[in-house]
Swiss-Prot record:
Protein name as it appears in the record: Sugar fermentation stimulation protein homolog
Protein's gene: sfsA
Organism: Chelativorans sp. (strain BNC1)
An example Gene Ontology molecular-function term: DNA binding
PANTHER family (UniProt xref): SUGAR FERMENTATION STIMULATION PROTEIN A
Regions crossing the membrane: none
Pfam families hit by this protein: SfsA, SfsA_N
InterPro entries: SfsA, SfsA_C, SfsA_N
Gene3D superfamilies per the UniProt record, alphabetical: 2.40.50.580, 3.40.1350.60
CDD domains linked to this entry: SfsA-like_bacterial
Family: Belongs to the SfsA family.
Length: 233
């Protein structure tokens, strides 16, 4: 995924109200920018952190700048939770994710389960449909180890239970985690931060739900899925 225009460098002053952050540009201008991430962004909100912003050329937008990338410990980390679906689709089409790239039809945002939408429904004329859920990952406490979630997510646990139900019904069900940082080679669940999610993942795996973790290269120009990361359980 290539950013449509060059990103603007700034320094983080603070993040607040989940969706907002104050930053200062290189020329000293202070701005309030939107934050496309409802999670805690644990470890990524230190004042003074280098950040990269995209800009919308829309005079109707209250906040024309949007936070896209935070630098943490010398590594660029993508925080936009609207991008993982796009990155997962790129990885699937590039045949990085098992045999999912052999499904000729990829339908985004399809209704299923109880009041939910699946991120992708993959269809093949000779195979059961594949229900694919995608989650964003940017949390790292131990060098090289990506973790999810960084806060409690009851919605995420429900999605795993619904994937398990789809698998028991004879469909294929797949959980994809997209790690928006290049310094991780392993992945595990944060059972200490959300035991319920870890338990739901165990139930899903027992039901036959597949799991893949996609790693990405991050730069000021693009975010590119380029490899699978090992699950460390």
């Amino acid at each position: 995924m290539i950013f449509p225009s060059p990103l603007t460098e700034a320094r983080l002053i603070r993040r607040y109200k989940r969706f907002l952050a104050d930053v200062v540009l290189a020329d000293g201008t202070e701005l309030t920018v939107s934050v496309p991430n409802t999670g805690s962004m644990l470890g990524l909100t230190a004042p003074g952190s280098r950040v990269l912003l995209s800009k919308w050329d829309d005079p109707k937008r209250k906040y024309p700048y949007r936070l896209e990338i935070v630098e943490a410990d010398g590594t660029l980390v993508g925080i936009n939770t609207g991008l993982p679906n796009r990155l997962a689709a790129e990885a699937i089409r590039a045949r990085l994710v098992g045999d999912l790239g052999t499904y000729p039809v990829i339908r985004p945002e399809q209704r299923y389960g109880e009041r939910s939408r699946i991120d992708f429904l993959l269809e093949h004329p000779e195979r059961p449909p594949a229900y694919v859920e995608v989650k964003n990952v940017h949390f790292m406490r131990e060098a090289g180890l990506a973790e999810f979630p960084d806060t409690r997510t009851d919605r995420g646990a429900r999605h795993l239970d619904e994937l398990a139900a789809m698998r028991r019904a004879g469909n294929r069900a797949v959980m994809i985690y997209v790690v928006q940082r290049a310094d991780c080679s392993r992945f595990r669940l944060c059972a200490d931060l959300d035991a319920s999610y870890a338990a739901a993942f165990g139930r899903a795996r027992d039901a036959g739900v597949e799991a893949f973790v996609i790693g990405c290269q991050i730069s000021a120009d693009a975010i590119a899925p380029d490899r699978l990361i090992d699950l460390d359980f």
